[in-house]
Amino acid sequence: DKVSIVLLLVLICGCSSMNQKMNDGIERIPIDVHNVSRDASLFIDKIELVPLETNDSSLLHKYRKVMYDKETDVYAVYTREQVIFTFSGNGAFISNSKKMQGQGPDEYHMAIDVKFNPYLQGLDLLNPYGTIYTYSLDFKLLAKRKIKPEFPIDHLIAFNTEEYIFTYPSLWTDQEVAFANLRTQQIYNANYNGTISSGNSMDKECFYKIGDNFYFIPP
């Protein structure tokens, strides 16, 4: 399928064969930003407008990002209030995460990134200090897991049920991503070059999975 994103770095390695400071195993794809095609049909099949159902439970504003998962045919909207709304592929409202915000054992206090998790069939919510809350699409807690990063983390994607990739804010590290195994609690760091912007990158999507490959776009 054609896609409409620019891929800058390809991550094609697993966590099991990495050194503590990994410098290889990453394929870097240079992009010529000065020679961009004006023919959008080369990478876009179609553009569709999907009206989202509006009711007392689905009203939202100031969203950070909108995600679509083709496998489940579900949209997720992540707002600046760190509330997530889910909708079916035709725009029907499913649920929101307001009822799960709080300090309870099944609740999340802070979620700075959200990602579909195909392995647990839910949504991963990331706390910057290393807690991952995985909820079903109607926001029932499926899993709550922890990792202890050296610094706060701000983006995530699951390799499988146990292995994840995270990014560190540029305030804390010099352009590094972290490969983590939640079962063994091992974390391996990899350097990259090519930060696109500075400042707050929380609203920017960094990780993509297309086929069997994982892609990383520096924030």
What does each model-identified segment do?
Residues 18-52:
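Blade/loop signatures of beta-propeller domains
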Residues 30-32, 73-79, 121-127, 162-172, ...:
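Short beta-strand elements that form the blades of beta-propeller/WD-repeat-like
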Residues 48-81:
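Beta-strand-rich domains and repeat architectures in extracellular enzymes and scaffolds
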Residues 53-58, 92-122, 127:
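Blade-loop segments of beta-propeller domains
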Residues 56, 98-106, 147-153, 192-198:
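Short coil/turn segments at the loop-to-beta-strand junctions that recur within blades
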Residues 62-65, 108-115, 150-159, 199-206:
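Repeated scaffold domains used in trafficking and secretory/extracellular systems
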Residues 88-90, 136-140, 181-185:
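Short loop/turn segments that connect beta-strands within beta-propeller blades
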